[in-house]
Amino acid sequence: MAHPLRGPLFENAAVVEAVKHRLNGAVRLPNLTFFRDRRGLEVDLLYPTPQGLAATEIKSGRTIASDWFGPTRRLAQALPEVTAQAVVYGGDEPQARRDATAVPLAGFADLLTALDTLPAAPTA
């Protein structure tokens, strides 16, 4: 049985990694947030990129579950600003899905770097 604080501590570690990444990249205000609505839809981290927002779920589990991708998928359907979806998880192997990426915590900084270097979205 896992420790009851494993999930919250893992989530905190991933958010701290995102804050570190932003601050080390000379972004003074990390402008990171989360999403939660009245109907219970919750996404752990919204990370601004040149293309829009990367919606990220953070899960401490070592084996990826398909339902982990549901919240980011639903948010992307509701908000056109969501242009990337990811799951950070407690396993070891990155995994590409149809519309999302799963990365281990150790690979999260590399994913953030890739998101930060996307070309900017065209303006109308």
Which role does the model predict for each range below?
Residues 1-124:
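A cross-kingdom feature that marks ATP-driven nucleic-acid transaction machinery
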